[in-house]
Structure formats: C-alpha cells, structure tokens
Regions:
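Secretory targeting and sorting signals
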Residues: 1-27
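Substrate-recognition/specificity elements adjacent to catalytic centers across diverse enzyme folds
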Residues: 30-246, 251-257, 269-271, 276-278, ...
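Long, charged, mostly alpha-helical binding arms that flank functional sites
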Residues: 65-126, 528-608
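Stable alpha-helical elements in mature extracytoplasmic
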Residues: 133-143, 257, 389, 404-408, ...
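A terminal-accessory region detector
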Residues: 175, 201-206, 431, 439-446, ...
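Glycine- and hydrophobic-rich flexible loops that cap the catalytic core of alpha/beta enzyme folds
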Residues: 268-280, 288-293, 297-462, 491
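Hydrophobic alpha-helical segments
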Residues: 305, 375, 415-540, 619-624
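Terminal end segments
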Residues: 508-591, 675-785
Length: 785
C-alpha cells in the first residue's frame, strides 16, 4: 500500500498516474480525466488537471451514488413525467409545487418552449456562465453519461430505476434546465398551480382570500415553517483560543428526492481545492470550505417574486390597461405527451397567459387571486433571468477570506434566495444577504401598493403593486447587474470579530450587539419577534467561547428553548387538572405519568429524553393559540415573548390532544424519544434525535407522524452538517455529517451508514489535506480515463 500512496502523492501534484486504473478506459485517451479517492463513508476526493476533468469526475461519482435520483430530475425538467409515469402521479416537489405529473410537465414545457434557459446560457458572463463553468458543466455531462454507458440501464443496482426506459444520457441543456428550476424554486416553482389560470368564463370567480391567509400560505409554502438552516460564524474574539474562527453550517433540507446534498472534495492542483456539499447534480461545492475560508447558506426572508394587479379592458379579459393604454396579453399553448392506461401516448395541451410583468396567475400557494372580468394578477419572479448563481459558486469555491466571499457575491449577484455566513483563517465572521431581491423601496411601496399589498408587505415582505401604472414597475440600482433588483450596496452585510449568525429570520439580529437596520421592508424587517431557534442561537453565541468541539456539542445538545419557556408551567398545569383528567377534543383524558415526565425532563431532544415526545406533540397542536402571557418586546428580543398562557382553553386542549395522540400510537406520556422517533432503512430501525424548529431546537428534524407508530420518517431537517475551525497554519479542523448518507440506493454501502452515525451522535472526520486523505483506512482509488 505504501507504493500506492507515494504514487498518489505524485499524481496529486502532476496528475500523471495511469497505473492504478480501476475505472473506465476510453479508447484513444492516454491520460486520466480525473481520479476519485474515496475515504470513509464513500466521500470522493476528486482530482483533475482541468475544469472539464473536475466536472467529469463529479458527474461520474455522483451518478454512481444517485443515478436514479438524478434521472428523476432530468425526466422532470424535460417535461416527460407523464410520458413515463402517467398524468396522475405526484409531481416532483423538489422542483415545483405542481400537484401531479401532468401539471409538472406543462409547467416545465412552457419554460422550455419559451427558450429562456437557452437564451441565458448563450449570454457571456456575467449574465451567462463564465468559460470555466461551461467546461465544468460539459465535463459533468460526459461523466454522468460515461457512468451510464458503463453500467447500462440493466446494470443499475438501485431498484428505483433499474432497467427503466426513462433513464437516459443527458445533455448540457438538461443540466442548465435543472439549475434554472432551482433558481426559480421560490418564485415560479412556488406558484406553479396558479399559472394554470384561464380567462373568466362567466361562472362566478372564487372569492379572494384575505391578506392574513396569503401570509400563512407564504410561510408554509416558502418553507419558513419547516425548511431552513442555521449558520453560525464565530470570529477570533468568540473563540476559546482568541484566534482563528469556527463555522457551523447546518441546512435543514429534504431527506428525499432532488434537494438532497451530496458530499465531495474538488481539486485542481494549484487552482482550486474545496470540500463540502452541493445539491444533487451541481458540480460545485455550494456549502463548504477551502484551506482558509468556510461558508454556509441559510434560507433568507426576502420574497423573491412580486405581484402586479392589472385592470382589464371592458369586455376583453385578455387585454389589460397600463397608463390608460390597452395591451394584449400574450398566450402560449404547450403540448406534452401523456401515457394512457394501455401504454399509448396522447397529447395534452394547456394555454398559459402573460403580461409585460410576467405570467397571469390565479393562486399563490393555495391563496386565491382570482382572474375576473375586471382585473387579473401577474407575477414577476426576480430570478426568472438569473443564471448567474453558477458563477457565484464557482468563485466561492476559490475564496481564501471573507473578503473573497463578499467579492464573489457582489461581482456575480447570482445567489437566488439564501443568506451567506462565512469565516476565515484571519478570524473574521461574516453575514451577508447579497442575493436577488425585487427592487421595491418603501417609498415606492407606499405609492404603488394595492390595499392587500400594504398588508402583505408589512407582514411578509410580498409586494403587490398597481400594474396600471408603469411608474410602479420595479426600480433599479447602478451597481445591480440587471434592472429590477437591488444592488449589493443596498443589501445587508456585516463583518465582525465575535460572531454573525442566521437561523432564517431577517438580517436584523445577525449579531445581538450590532443590529442591522434601515433596509427596505422587502429586504429585511426589524424590531420584530425572532423565532425560538434564532433566540437559541443568539443566546448561545452571547454566552459562549467556542471550539470546534463545543460547537458540535451545542448542535447535538438538542436543547429546546421553547421547553425552557413553557415546560415547567405545562407540568404545573398537568398537575392541576381535577381528578387527573385533562380536557381534549374527544373528552377528558387521564394524565398518568405525564406530569412527572415533564417536571423531570431536561428540555432536550436526545434519544433517551423522557417527556420530549409529549411536549413535541403538544407544541405541534398549538397552532395560532395565544401561547404566552408576556408579549414580544423589541427592546428585549432574546427573552420575549415568554411565560406559558396556561389558563387558555386552547393550550389546555392541545395538551390533552397530545396525550390522546400518543396513546393511539402506543406510546406512554413518558416515552423516550427513541421509542417514538426513528427511520427505517433496509429493515433496520434507526432512532433519530432532534426536533422541529418551532421548538427552538437548533438540530432541526421535521418528522412525519404516523398515528399508529409515532414519528416514523423524516421529511426534512439537518442534512449536510459541517463544523470547520481555522487556527494557526495547519489544516482546517473539520467534521461533517450527511445525515441521510451519500446514496439513495438501498443496495449501496453508503445508503444509511452516516444515518447510523448521526443516530449515535458521531461525526465524520474531515480529510482535506493530502496527508489526511492518504491516511484514510478506507482509501479506495478509481482512475477515470
């Protein structure tokens, strides 16, 4: 083995080894395209001599682990789900909110027919991909196709697509369509069902919803109630050593389908060396670190689309009026092929309507915005012309400092809907929400908002503007790369030496000692209640001096701030019920050991915590109940609101209903978390620690409740987790976990190995530097030629 390691060290410097080939040989090519060096848990360290080779290695390795998941993505963005799976099956929620395959296909077909993706790709940088990005993408496509050519459909080991005719070689167009779908996830992808709007036929239109209902739809649909992330950047003054930095990256993302992360290290000697993870099919590191800088992303609060209400011409619902002049809507009929019960194909057609602002719609995340004889609503997605994010992550992958991170964000302006939190070896901590945001100033909103828009902007940052006036179109900034978005100078950023963090609230309290204020409402609110999870992170940052080990312990402490605020009072309420009977929706229910379990609970969601399941189900049932007696105070944002409103009938009933729910699932009130929260992989039950974000738990796990068994699966939660420390001149001190593991293939050894690690509270040692990679006891080499 020693001579192999020496040869690999030479290869890392010169990329000339050919004697260790265990991969794919391609006739006529004498040198390796890439070398994959696998370490523990199937993590590939991909080395190539150029960007095309780097993409090739990524494409081949990612297909090896997840060919079926990737094939699902490509059949979706090519609008062929109905052709292969029929029209009625569930759409692909990773990429749109389409309710079924047919609507998914029609949605993506109208994007494809519009030519928008091809047009953006054809542009030079900065609007289109820079040359190096094009080389990476070209290599990625060839690498994916090389894997498929080697295995063949019948050789795929994953039963999800073994032998399936919908698994096929891909093109660069497939790749760019996939990226575009990611960019518009928070806009066009969120309102997919609403785009199936038709001119009024004379039948009564559905009643419009209230602004409060729209706010609820936005919070649920855009993920603010579940999907999200934590990012904590600790600078030198916040570390125990007083130098260097520590970063926690902890995105809370789906455990299934196309929004899974996949981990790798990408190296071109002397040019790029970066480790971390990316969404499936993206041959860059999107969250990770270089030798001197580390970064993560968190889902941000700005709503990246806006609505325009347009008046219609009398008697013509497809003509609208701007500045007193009529304009015809444009229409596009799209056609997709649909598999019938007998296996034959028949066409299905749909007409989509559009205005100067964007497509006409009649629904926003389940909230009706009717197209009537008098008015219609059009949507503008600020990311609809954004192909720049690929350039952003290319540049982030070469960052050596937080200054480089800011430079990458400002020069590319491609981040679609996330904050960036970063650290560097010099001891800096950065928060930046330099992303695509609709250019709607407060003064413009005051002059142009509709009555509903006045409420939705204040509550959730959604602008609904008067489309009858061209002066109400989105504005622009001199430093913006395209009209209609804010330039970087107008967006929040802050660098400090103690800490910066975000847990999916606005920019206001990225540091409790240095609030970020004065931004347009659409960019960031201020003086507003912070989530329990944000408060948990801020309180920890204010009270601690961090090491990498203490940061890992903070995350896996699974501590619940909401439990600190309410559990003791809930235990007292439990003990106060007459006759030991709590009220519930189905009548009185005995409290049994519930009171003692809550009173002795440590307020954590570790596997052996008793009382945690009961409190979780109680909190999940509170809904809009007025739960606290002490309201939010903007002068005390870390400690308010507080004190459980134990006298409220809704609070009492939620407790009783939680008891009933546990009993129906066969779980006693004092059950351990491990008894009622687990996933099953290849027949093995794996207990899962953590809990929902609304409980103020940093290590978010959003489980799927089975009434007969308890929490039986994870919908989304902690996914790719990294803790990265810099100190002195040595290698980055990194630990990672991919909670659902590298592969979605149940036949892979990397299907659930890291899930078991996560269950035990263990981490994967980061192997970034050459010596660490070569010391891996699991080292396995694949040379791709």
């Amino acid at each position: 083995m020693t001579h192999i390691r020496k040869a690999l060290a030479v290869f890392a410097a010169a990329l000339s080894v050919t004697t260790l080939c265990t991969g794919v040989a391609t006739a006529g090519e004498d040198s390796a395209k890439a070398v994959l060096r696998y370490t523990e848990h199937g993590i590939p360290h991909i080395v190539a001599k150029d960007y095309a080779g780097l993409g090739y290695g990524y494409g081949y390795a990612s297909a090896t682990d997840n060919v079926c998941e990737l094939a699902k993505i490509y059949v979706t963005v090519s609008a062929q789900r109905s052709r292969y799976f029929g029209p009625d099956g569930e759409g692909y929620p990773s990429l749109s909110e389409a309710k079924n395959n047919l609507h998914s296909d029609l949605f993506f077909q109208q994007i494809n027919d519009s030519g928008v993706v091809d047009g953006l790709v054809a542009q030079p940088a900065p609007q289109g991909p820079r040359p190096e990005v094009r080389q990476i993408v070209s290599g990625y496509v060839k690498g994916f196709n090389a894997y498929l050519a080697r295995t063949g459909r019948s050789g795929i080991t994953d039963p999800a697509c073994r032998g399936a005719d919908w698994v096929r070689p891909i093109s660069e167009q497939d790749f760019y369509r996939h990226y575009y779908s990611i960019a518009v996830t928070g806009g066009l992808g969120f309102v997919t069902e609403g785009l199936f709007a038709a001119p009024p036929s004379g039948a009564p239109s559905p009643a419009p919803g209230t602004p409060a209902q729209l706010s609820a739809s936005l919070r649920d649909g855009l993920g603010k109630g579940g999907l999200g992330s934590n990012g904590i950047a600790v600078g030198a003054d916040g570390t125990a050593a007083g130098r260097g930095s520590v970063l926690l990256g902890n995105p809370h993302y789906p455990w299934h389908d196309g929004r899974r992360f996949w981990q790798s290290q990408l190296t071109i000697p002397g040019r790029v060396d970066v480790a971390g993870a990316s969404l499936l099919g993206m041959p860059f590191v999107m969250i990770g670190h270089t030798a001197d800088a580390a970064w993560t992303h968190t889902v941000s609060t700005p709503v990246t689309f806006g609505l325009f209400e347009v008046p219609l011409a009398p008697g013509d619902p497809t003509t609208y009026v701007v500045d007193g002049k009529p304009e015809k809507m444009t229409s596009r009929e799209v056609t997709v092929q649909v598999r019938q019960a007998d296996g034959s194909l028949k066409p299905a057609r749909q007409t989509f309507w559009s205005t100067r602002y964007g497509p006409v719609l009649n629904d926003v995340g389940g909230f009706p915005v009717p197209w009537t004889a008098k008015s219609a609503y059009a949507l503008r997605d600020a990311n609809a012309t954004n192909m720049r994010g690929l350039n952003t992550w290319f540049e982030l992958d070469q960052a050596r400092s937080t200054a480089d991170v800011v430079r990458a964000l400002k020069s590319t302006q491609g981040v679609p809907w996330v904050n960036t939190i970063a650290t560097d070896r010099a001891g800096n901590a950065l928060y930046a929400d330099i992303q695509v945001v609709p250019h709607v100033t407060d003064s413009q909103a005051a002059a142009c908002s509709t009555p509903a828009g006045q409420q939705t902007l204040a509550a959730d940052g959604l602008a609904i503007l008067d489309g009858s006036r061209s002066s109400c179109q989105w504005g622009s900034d001199p430093d913006a790369l395209e009209p209609g978005i804010f330039g970087p100078s107008r967006l929040p950023q802050q660098q400090r030496r103690d800490y910066e963090l975000n847990a999916n609230d606005s920019a206001w309290l990225s540091n409790a000692r240095a609030p970020l204020t004065g931004f347009p409402r659409i960019v960031s609110d201020q003086d507003s209640e912070r989530s329990p999870r944000t408060r948990e992170a801020l309180l920890a940052a204010e009270a601690s001096k961090f090491t990498t080990d203490s940061m890992k312990k903070l995350l896996f402490a699974d501590h619940s701030l909401f439990a600190d605020l309410a559990a003791a009072d809930l235990a007292k309420l439990c003990a106060s019920f007459p006759g030991g009977q709590a009220p519930s929706s189905s009548g009185p229910v005995p409290v049994g050991p519930a009171c003692d379990a809550l009173a002795s609970w440590d307020h954590r969601y570790t596997l052996d915590s008793r009382g945690s399941l009961l409190f979780q189900r109680f909190a999940a049932r509170l809904g809009n109940v007025d739960r606290f007696t002490v309201p939010f105070d903007p002068k005390a944002p870390l400690t308010t609101p507080n004190t459980l409103n134990a006298g409220d009938a809704g609070v009492q009933k939620a407790f009783g209903d939680a008891l009933v729910e546990l009993r129906a699932a066969g779980l006693p009130p004092d059950a351990r978390l491990r008894d009622g929260q687990a996933v099953t992989r290849n027949g093995e039950r794996i207990p899962i620690h953590g809990a929902q974000g609304f409980l103020g738990v940093l290590n978010v796990m959003t489980p799927v409740w089975d009434p007969a068994r308890g929490n039986a699966e994870v919908a989304h939660g902690s996914s790719f987790v990294q803790v990265v420390g810099f100190s002195g001149r040595g290698c980055p001190d990194s630990s990672t976990l991919l909670t659902y593991s590298q592969s979605a293939n149940p036949a892979s050894p990397y299907f659930s190995d890291q899930t078991k690690l996560y269950s035990r509270g263990e981490w994967v040692k980061g192997r970034f530097c050459e010596a660490d990679i070569l010391r891996s006891p699991a080292l396995r080499i694949v040379v791709l030629r």
